[in-house]
Regions:
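Conserved C-terminal active-site "lid" loop/helix of NAD(P)H-dependent oxidoreductases
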Residues: 230-236, 252-297
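Catalytic helix-loop patch of NAD(P)-dependent Rossmann-fold dehydrogenases
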Residues: 84, 88, 92-96, 116-158, ...
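Mid/C-terminal beta-alpha module of Rossmann-like enzyme folds, strongest
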Residues: 207, 214-258
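NAD(P)H-binding glycine-rich loop region in Rossmannoid oxidoreductase-like domains
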Residues: 48-89, 100
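NAD(P)-dependent short-chain dehydrogenase/reductase
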Residues: 146-196, 210
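SDR active-site strand-loop-helix element
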Residues: 7, 30, 66-70, 108-114, ...
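N-terminal Rossmann NAD(P)H-binding glycine-rich loop of SDR-like oxidoreductase domains
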Residues: 2-24
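Rossmann-fold cofactor-recognition segment
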Residues: 38-50
Length: 297
């Protein structure tokens, strides 16, 4: 089997990739602080901001593929969080990884975001749609994409849509908090005016691993679900399938949140992905599975 090195292995998406990748690939996964499920696999604690540590692990592992998920992902910086944290991780470390992948002949699978697109150019955006990131997070992810293309030819850039599911160990996501609140009969505020094409953590990680195991390269791919919906719509589906009280859903607009970056529609066209044979499941199918396998959060 091909050997793969995973960055951000203790993150929300990384832990799912850890679970799925061994079916197809020989993995070494990495973490910086909390290991999450990395301890269950061949793993190493590294700081991707340390160029020497990065080179040492790539030199020692000699991966055929590097799946780069590590990132600073907060859409809005936390209080007193300096912008340089975004640039150091999302740009500089990504550039270093791309250079090392070129040096050691490793394919780089770079996980980016749907938020690099302009949020006012229509629905079901193709990969060549206009790019106007509205947040520091999205801006640095886009610069990261540019660094990948600048320093290596053997790459795949995967722009992921909103991820939903149940975070493993210490990781969490908005969907998980929504489910927990509804189960405990607590109200949930949800946007009615932001549209995306959500994809489950399970489907996203399966597709990323499958793409990593192929020789496909030199391309940008949208990775999302087939349905364009708002977070409010997602909450409605969850209530219907889980038997929760829809009156707990409090519909709000982005204008209701001071200083919130207004990204109205970054729903993704996934025809290129589908042409490669990938077919994400519907939201109803995924949520039904989540409810069946996670009776308690």
């Amino acid at each position: 089997m091909k050997k793969v090195l995973i960055t951000g292995g203790s993150g929300l998406l990384g832990q799912y990739i850890n679970l799925i990748a061994p079916k197809r690939l020989s993995i070494v996964t990495t973490f910086r602080n909390n290991p999450g499920n990395c301890k269950e696999f061949p793993s190493s604690k590294i700081d991707i901001l340390n160029a020497n540590q990065l080179e040492n692990i790539i030199q020692n592992v000699k991966p055929a593929v590097v799946i780069h998920t590590a990132a600073v992902t907060n859409p809005i910086p936390k209080k007193n969080q300096p912008p340089k944290e975004y640039f150091n991780t999302n740009v500089t470390a990504t550039k270093n990884i791309a250079e090392l992948c070129a040096q050691y002949n490793s394919k780089l699978v770079y996980v980016s975001t749907d938020l690099v697109y302009a949020g006012y150019r229509g629905s079901f955006l193709k990969e060549d749609a206009k790019l106007i990131p509205a947040t520091l997070y999205a801006e640095t992810k886009l610069i990261g994409e540019q660094k990948v293309k600048e320093f290596t030819d053997n790459y795949l850039i995967i722009r992921t849509a909103l991820l939903y599911g149940i975070g493993l160990n210490h990781s969490r996501c908005h969907f998980q908090d929504m489910l927990n609140n509804l189960r405990n009969k607590r109200p949930v505020k949800l946007f009615v005016d932001q549209f995306r094409t959500p994809i489950s953590l399970t489907d996203a990680s399966e597709i990323i691993v499958n793409l990593a195991s192929t020789d496909h390269k030199g391309e940008i791919l949208n990775l999302g679900g087939v349905e364009r919906i708002s977070r409010s719509d997602l909450g409605e589906i969850l209530c219907s399938l889980g038997g929760f009280d829809k009156n707990l859903l409090q519909k709000i607009t982005m204008d209701d949140i001071p200083n919130f970056p207004k990204v109205e529609d970054v729903s993704l066209n996934i025809e290129k992905l589908q042409a490669l044979g990938f077919k994400p499941r519907t939201i109803q199918e995924n949520i039904s599975e989540i409810l069946a396998t996670n009776s308690r959060i």
